[in-house]
Amino acid sequence: LGDVYKRQITNNPLVPQMLDEEHEVDYSEISYEDVLGKVRDRIHEGHLLLSHPLSGSVKPNETPYKSVMISRKAGKLDERSLSIIEGAIRSCAKFEFKSEKYREFMPETFKDFQLIDWTLLQSAISSADVW
């Protein structure tokens, strides 16, 4: 899939800095959970989920940042994409979010979390390009 087929939804400020104008980035200063909700809304509009919303080894409650790749164009509702994002939202609801505690005690960890999220997204973009 070329860049014209992908859109990144993120709350990570590093992502729009790292991607050029050929990439469509939907950046908002929102919570991790709100990113997933925004992705779910786009899936209901007919976009496809192109990266897993719970990718990586950092638990959702331990990082404030999330980037998810979806198709740029909408089609009909994809039940598999919807099932995956709804499962991710249910999983997140089980966690008590700890990331705000890091802000007070270790603000430098937020840069680390941004980099981890960016690396996961970069890998997803590269994998999608192989399709």
Segments predicted by a language model, with ranges:
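Short, small-residue-biased leader/transition segments that mark boundaries at the very start
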Residues: 1-5
